Amino acid sequence: MNVGIIGNGFVGNAVYQNVRDKVETKIYDVDKNRSLNTFDEVLQQELIFVCVPTPMKADGSCDLSILDKLFEDISNKNLEFLEERTFVIKSTIPIGTTKKLAEKYPLLWIVHNPEFLTARNAVNDLAKADRTVIGGDSTLTSRVAKLYWGYVYYGEDHNIIQCSSDESEAIKYFSNTFLAYKVAYFNKVYDVCEKLGMEYKNVRKGITTDPRIGKTHTQVPGIDKDRGFGGTCFPKDLNSLIHQMESHDINADMLTEVWLYNESIRKVIDWVIT
């Protein structure tokens, strides 16, 4: 087995660092300073991880232009050259995207394998992941599962969830949105404590000792010393899910309120809008 990686940001690098010593691995990025191999060299590998940005548009929707252009470029290659290559999208993408790409490019084998990483600790997060989700045709997802079981987790009793690509895309959005909601909720708890003269650390401890709730995502201010949530993931994923729900006439008021509250308490606007 050998692996190719397209995109050498924190996600692509996490994949690279976790497999490079176990299987032949090649990595390409549009930034030449981040590339160790050419685009064509990466496309010759059996499993090709796609780790490209999917930022937020001004209307909150997900910008798929980089991903779309990438697959257009891949499809223009000699198709025999791509025979039996499996493309593993790790980017966060709207529900239905993998299926649409597979229908548009029927000669390309495409699955979705969302990441659950923090930018600060991505390599270790992948090495110690509590689950791996792989969505798509079961024959293809099994190929990806083989890599994780055989070369990342060494046959450990690692939880690999194989499902449809729609489900894997949804799992990523609902996971991140829940955590964003949790951050906002505990910021509101902090507001109440400040208003009524209570010690937040005591209230927090009393709540988070319950194992059903847990302590993660409850520090206020956060590790970035700011209120609410920011960064590359939670803002864009929450807004994308709101946009997807509204486009299907599903009420998203609860999530919209979370976003409006976050904007009201967040000092640093550190998310990217295209």
What are these regions (language model features)?
Residues 1-43, 47:
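NAD(P)+-binding Rossmann beta1-loop-alpha1 motif at the extreme N-terminus of oxidoreductases
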Residues 2, 23-25, 42, 194-274:
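NAD(P)-dependent Rossmann-like dehydrogenase/reductase catalytic/cofactor-binding core
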Residues 11, 92-96, 179:
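Gly/Ser/Thr-rich loops at beta-strand to alpha-helix junctions
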Residues 47, 55-121:
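Rossmann-like NAD(P)(H) cofactor-binding subdomain of soluble oxidoreductases
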Residues 47-51, 133:
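Structural motif
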Residues 102-113, 118-216, 244-251, 257, ...:
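Internal alpha-helical scaffold of NAD(P)-dependent oxidoreductase catalytic cores
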